[in-house]
Amino acid sequence: MLLFETVREMGHEQVLFCHSKNPEIKAIIAIHDTTLGPAMGATRILPYINEEAALKDALRLSRGMTYKAACANIPAGGGKAVIIANPENKTDDLLRAYGRFVDSLNGRFITGQDVNITPDDVRTISQETKYVVGVSEKSGGPAPITSLGVFLGIKAAVESRWQSKRLDGMKVAVQGLGNVGKNLCRHLHEHDVQLFVSDVDPIKAEEVKRLFGATVVEPTEIYSLDVDIFAPCALGGILNSHTIPFLQASIIAGAANNQLENEQLHSQMLAKKGILYSPDYVINAGGLINVYNEMIGYDEEKAFKQVHNIYDTLLAIFEIAKEQGVTTNDAARRLAEDRINNSKRSKSKAIAA
């Protein structure tokens, strides 16, 4: 990987490589764009196969956060942090050392909870920096509002595809039954949807079966089901050249980040199959909306009102895609970049005045 060329092509402002010997820590903080506000992005801990894989994850996720904030009309930019480590070796000393790196940016980057980071970990990080959000006691955690946003996004996709506001009787396959996936199943069950679910943890799958009458399938079977909607709510990269040919769903709308392994190639493959794709960073923006509201003083009513905008934003994106003959992923990116560029122009005019 040519580092500076890659960073330039993806439009990043800053990438920090954080290293400490005592305690041993390797972390990458990627700041994509701060035009609309400070870079917001959660922190994850994963045992990446190599440093290039960690950097690729941080760069792509931070860019997605920029677009997510812009599409959600949140005055924030995009960032992301990855700690290269086995989560089983996580210690308070490591987390506090990482917190000091975050603090050194003086609010340019604000972080929170992601893969293998718990609310307790966030509290440990907060001992070293105030630039951390998402502590569960303040807002109740992001899962309820994120799942609501995904549910509203599914309704928007159904309206765009079939000009209908009804979900009853539809078949929906949900992949991944963590907090967001489980909450999404609850919303869908309440609207008389026929659920098919999978998870690598059979205990989670059996719980959703018991609670919502879902049909449990093997993780490898979830792609090829004859359903109306496929909702990926696990890890990213699952829409790729291997899985897309198996898909029978008419709509893809789920909570997972970076669902497309290759944004350009695989968004086009979906479009050619006639599948309506709901861009992940738009439909799953509820988590960002939640932590942003926590940062400014949490108001649950205001946060849930903002998440309802996901419905209208997706309808606008689907319309842009139709009118301009582009993929929905490109339409979402254009909407986000238009908002960012408009902000840049406004700032330039203000400086000139």
Swiss-Prot record:
SUPFAM superfamilies reported in the protein's UniProt record: Aminoacid dehydrogenase-like, N-terminal domain, NAD(P)-binding Rossmann-fold domains
Catalytic activity from the UniProt record: L-tryptophan + NAD(+) + H2O = indole-3-pyruvate + NH4(+) + NADH + H(+)
Effect annotated for changing residue 69 to M: 293-fold decrease in catalytic efficiency
Effect of residue 292 to H: 2.6-fold decrease in catalytic efficiency
Description of how activity is regulated: Highly susceptible to inhibition by indole-3-pyruvate. Activity is not affected by the presence of metal ions, EDTA, KCl or DMSO.
Enzyme's top EC category: oxidoreductase
EC number: 1.4.1.19
SMART domains: ELFV_dehydrog
One of the Pfam families matching this protein, by short name: ELFV_dehydrog
Any one GO MF annotation of this record: nucleotide binding
Keywords, sorted A to Z: NAD, Nucleotide-binding, Oxidoreductase
Catalytic residues of the enzyme: 80
Subunit architecture: Homodimer.
Similarity-based family: Belongs to the Glu/Leu/Phe/Val dehydrogenases family.
Function: Catalyzes the reversible oxidative deamination of L-tryptophan to indole-3-pyruvate in the presence of NAD(+). Shows weak activity with L-phenylalanine, but cannot use other L-amino acids and D-Trp. Cannot use NADP(+) for oxidative deamination of L-Trp, and shows only weak activity with NADPH for reductive amination of indole-3-pyruvate. Involved in the biosynthesis of scytonemin, a cyanobacterial radiation-absorbing pigment.
Record comment regarding domains: Contains a substrate-binding domain and an NAD(+)/NADH-binding domain, separated by a deep cleft containing the active site. Several residues in the active site form a hydrophobic cluster, which may be a part of the hydrophobic core essential for protein folding.
UniProt name for this protein: L-tryptophan dehydrogenase
Species assigned in the record: Nostoc punctiforme
